[in-house]
């Protein structure tokens, strides 16, 4: 949520800031602005709406000159999306200019204190409180002021500040919100995420909580809140700039759907050797795995759907009790965690605020934490006992596709590792299953050929007001994901239900022509789900059945049939999700929606 960029160097700051903000659009935003310093004065241009609106406004005012600046895309939390509430904000008499991601929890009491001191507020934001507070503490020493601000506020933040009497300098800090420093030659950069600086440098500092960075064009110095200099290793980005570009595709989501075979292959292949699973990142011994009392899985959004699938898979293959929680619920219900329990946290960004808080809750109760993360060196990755990276590469579209599939791949690997440790996976069976796993990329390549068929299906149902998804077991977990994909990018109301729950109220919503996706790929549950298909069909539903090649009998009761290859039942989620992603994509395209940046959503939810 929100995005920060900064630049200090010898080149014009404005185009660099704008380019950086465009690379952060995936994070979600409703307004944007930049501030550029020149000749002891910092000028601000900001507006509600998209970055193109900001560019138009910059053109109207003749642009901003200067070689030092900061920029921001805002996702509204305190105050409506307006020009006034957009960042950057001024502090004091205008000598301080500040941008901020996060939430300041004690902003009301600080605002009252500052108002009593004569500070005048023009916006509804908590960020303006930070700007005035920085001015309040600023006596000519940027580091002193930042430390005092950090000791005064409560909440989460990444912040960047310009002071008019310190030309050529940016000071920044973070707590529970990501921030990186890009290292150049005669120039340095600041950003919420790597794509914003990748055009200019591959070398970065990844700031940790309670760290401060002071940037000039020739130097970057890091400090802690005791003002000690912090020495940090340089992180070198290995993936290509093209990985964060569309490369001829109409949308990032379309490109990332097509990249799923590679994401799964790259996640699996280093961890399968000669038909055996090897996860060197996982330090749990066989004895520790045998003594696991319960696996607690915590995640948000689509990652939670991966966790739902993981529960079924772990319990089936390893017979270890498993509980899957929404991270936002887990942390507040005082979960019961006993000795020997482990917690698996799943997050694409590694910065999801609720998931990070849940991780800390689990660790405080003595659980060993294993994370499944896509972004290297992210906060969740750093704070976990073990981290297993998905090799999906940068995922730009807000709606996850390839990261979701790579997360499932890690779940399969963990299930095999756990099953082997507890003595439930003979060597020959392990070889059979790993062979099936390594077939997934090619099977998905074949499913991508269903594009025309699914586009035709989208044309048929694009006018629908409601779409329902049903399934049992693992098919229910993927029904949840299919429903979420559809509603988050096409804005069509959609719900997923466990098929066995239809008679407990949901079936009353089925009317003549209501589209119902029935995911029915699990052999042992097929007949039961077929019964549910008959129930909704009898009430006028248009049934789209998603089945394997083995389930020919469904054709008699379904209006449309989508077939996926047969594989081990526990691996079917990776195949089932592909047609649902493609269908959702074309529904959104046909409805004229912003596929990559759905309204009100953010890629990385870094506030609670």
Residue positions per predicted region:
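Conserved short alpha-helical segments that host acidic/polar catalytic motifs at enzyme active sites
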Residues: 1-251, 262-294, 305, 332, ...
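Glycine-rich oxoanion-binding loops at beta->alpha junctions
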Residues: 67, 71-84, 273-286, 310-346, ...
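Structural motif
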Residues: 68, 96, 294-296, 342, ...
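Acidic/histidine-rich
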Residues: 156-187, 457, 462-488, 530
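Generic C-terminus detector
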Residues: 227, 542, 555-557, 567-608
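Active-site phosphate/pyrophosphate-binding segments
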Residues: 260-264, 268-296, 386-515, 588-608
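Glycine-rich phosphate-binding loops that contact phosphosugars or nucleotide phosphates
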Residues: 290-439, 519-563, 583, 591
């Amino acid at each position: 949520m929100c995005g920060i960029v900064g630049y200090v160097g010898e080149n014009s700051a404005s185009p660099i800031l704008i380019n950086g903000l465009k690379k952060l659009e995936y994070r979600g935003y409703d307004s944007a602005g930049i501030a550029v310093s020149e000749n002891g004065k910092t000028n601000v241009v900001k507006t509600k709406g998209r970055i193109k609106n900001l560019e138009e406004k910059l053109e109207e005012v003749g642009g901003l000159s200067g070689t030092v600046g900061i920029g921001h895309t805002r996702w509204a939390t305190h105050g409506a999306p307006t020009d006034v509430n957009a960042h950057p904000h001024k502090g004091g008499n205008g000598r301080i200019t500040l941008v901020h991601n996060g939430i300041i929890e004690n902003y009301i009491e600080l605002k009252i204190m500052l108002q009593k001191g004569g500070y005048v507020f023009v916006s509804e934001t908590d960020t303006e409180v930070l700007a005035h507070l920085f001015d309040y503490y600023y006596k000519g020493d940027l580091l002193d002021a930042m430390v005092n601000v950090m000791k005064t506020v409560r909440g989460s933040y990444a912040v960047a500040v310009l002071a008019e009497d310190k030309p050529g300098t940016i000071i920044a800090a973070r707590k529970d919100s990501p921030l990186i420093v890009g290292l150049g030659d005669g120039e340095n950069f600041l950003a919420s995420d790597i794509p914003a600086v990748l055009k200019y440098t591959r070398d970065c500092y990844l700031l940790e909580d309670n760290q401060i960075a002071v940037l000039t064009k020739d130097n970057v110095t890091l400090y802690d809140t005791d003002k000690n200099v912090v020495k940090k290793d340089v992180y070198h980005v290995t993936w290509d700039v093209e990985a964060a570009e569309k490369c001829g595709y109409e949308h990032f989501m379309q490109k990332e759907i097509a990249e799923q075979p590679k994401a799964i292959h790259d996640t699996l292949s280093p961890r399968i050797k000669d038909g055996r699973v090897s996860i060197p990142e996982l330090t749990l011994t066989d004895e520790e795995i045998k003594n696991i009392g319960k696996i607690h899985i915590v995640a948000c959004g689509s990652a939670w759907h991966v966790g739902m699938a993981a529960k079924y898979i772990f319990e089936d293959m390893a017979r270890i009790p498993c509980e899957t929680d929404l991270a936002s619920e887990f942390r507040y219900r005082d979960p019961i965690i006993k000795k020997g329990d482990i917690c698996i946290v799943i997050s694409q960004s590694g910065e999801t605020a609720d998931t990070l808080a849940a991780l800390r809750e689990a660790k405080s109760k003595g659980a060993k934490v294993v994370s499944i993360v896509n972004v290297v060196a992210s906060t969740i990755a750093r704070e976990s006992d073990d981290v297993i990276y998905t090799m999906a590469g940068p995922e730009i579209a807000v709606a996850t596709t390839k990261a979701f599939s790579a997360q499932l791949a890690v779940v399969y690997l963990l299930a095999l590792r756990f099953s082997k440790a507890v003595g439930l996976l003979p060597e020959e069976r392990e070889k059979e299953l790993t062979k099936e796993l390594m077939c997934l990329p090619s099977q998905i390549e074949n499913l991508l050929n269903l594009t025309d068929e699914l586009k035709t299906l989208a044309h048929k149902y694009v006018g629908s007001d409601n779409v329902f998804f049903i399934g049992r077991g693992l098919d229910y977990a993927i029904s949840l994901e299919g429903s979420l994909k559809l509603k988050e990018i096409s804005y069509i109301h959609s719900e997923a239900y466990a098929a066995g729950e239809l008679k407990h109220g949901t079936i009353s919503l089925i009317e003549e022509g209501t589209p119902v996706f029935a995911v029915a790929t699990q052999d042992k549950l097929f007949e039961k789900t077929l019964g549910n298909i008959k129930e909704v069909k009898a009430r006028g539903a248009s049934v789209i059945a998603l089945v394997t090649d083995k389930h020919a009998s469904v054709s008699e009761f379904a209006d449309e049939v989508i077939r996926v290859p047969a594989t081990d039942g526990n691996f079917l989620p990776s195949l089932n999700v592909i047609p649902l992603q493609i269908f959702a994509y074309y529904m959104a395209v046909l409805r004229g929606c912003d596929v990559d940046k759905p309204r009100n959503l953010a890629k990385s939810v870094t506030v609670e």
